[in-house]
Design a protein with these regions (language model features):
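Conserved GTPase G-domain substructure that encodes guanine base recognition and part of the catalytic core
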Residues: 3-165
């Protein structure tokens, strides 16, 4: 979005960072979390980044190291079909979000052969007297922790995994 020259520079930096390894040859980057805008219809640039930059340059085990999250689930249909009292999508919005998940999964798989399992969430907000609670944020955190190699986790909380199963 910053122009062709800046996009090329960012792409080279991504590839360089994804290729970095430690002294034992292990990748320094364990996980890439790609956050897509739930309200956007044009995800072409995002697919190009996922398919041509991240997946193409991520090395071994990429299937388990790429997470895709669709942010602003509450705004995916411009704020319609969100039950603000229950802080959750109604069935029409769930269907819309599930279709977006399926579309992202299928487009990535068709282009790369890599299976990703996108999730949707809303981070919530607070300000100027308004407030919205997070939705599916703990699920996103669970997916992140689950995807990080256990030996690199700073903390191991067995109850967290039991409650998320």
């Amino acid at each position: 979005g910053d122009g062709k020259e800046a996009d090329n520079r960012h792409t080279k930096n991504f590839i360089k960072k994804l290729s970095e390894v430690d002294k034992n040859g292990n990748a320094l980057i364990d996980l890439v979390l790609v956050i897509l805008d739930g309200g956007s219809r044009d995800l072409g640039t995002s697919y190009e980044l996922i398919n041509k930059v991240i997946i193409s340059n991520f090395g071994q085990g990429k299937e388990n190291r790429i997470l895709v999250a669709i942010h602003q689930a509450n705004m995916a249909m411009k704020g319609r079909n969100w039950d603000y009292a229950k802080n959750e999508p109604n069935q029409r919005l769930v269907n819309f979000l599930e279709e977006k998940v399926r579309s992202v999964r299928d487009r990535v798989y068709e282009a790369t052969g890599v299976i990703v399992e996108p999730i949707y969430y809303s981070a919530g907000y607070k300000g100027w007297g308004e407030q919205s609670r997070p939705y599916n944020l703990s699920k996103l955190l669970y997916y992140i922790v689950k995807a990080i190699p256990s030996e690199k986790r700073a903390i191991r909380v067995p109850w967290f995994y039991r409650c998320m199963s």
